[in-house]
């Protein structure tokens, strides 16, 4: 009986390690799409669209983002948008733009 329990424990540990590795890999892909490819600039780029791009499902996206950031998908996307907006607002290059225009350029869809 002890060997059976030990075997099951090792099997569970293996599954957990695989899950962690897959979660890490998916998070890297999420960051690649959002941060590097700047897909967040599209106001309609949803978790569902990201899941389609990554050949997974939106639930996995939500779980992985939550595990790695403590936030949800929308908070992650808005974080990227806010960083861009802050950078643009500080830049003399964008001094002639309104806050609303900058927000729209950063992927926000409205003034709300």
Residues of each region from the PLM?
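Membrane-proximal linker segments that couple transmembrane helices to downstream signaling/catalytic modules
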Residues: 2-101, 105
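The DNA-contacting recognition helix of HTH DNA-binding domains
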Residues: 58, 110-112
């Amino acid at each position: 009986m002890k060997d059976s329990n030990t075997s099951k424990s090792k099997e569970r540990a293996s599954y957990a390690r695989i899950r962690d590795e897959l979660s890490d890999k998916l998070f890297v892909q999420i960051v690649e799409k959002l941060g590097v490819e700047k897909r967040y600039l599209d106001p309609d780029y949803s978790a569902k669209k990201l899941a389609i791009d990554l050949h997974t499902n939106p639930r996995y996206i939500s779980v992985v983002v939550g595990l790695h950031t403590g936030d949800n998908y929308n908070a992650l996307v808005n974080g990227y948008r806010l960083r861009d907006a802050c950078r643009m607002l500080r830049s003399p290059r964008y001094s002639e733009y309104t806050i609303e225009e900058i927000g729209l350029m950063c992927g926000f869809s409205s003034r709300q």
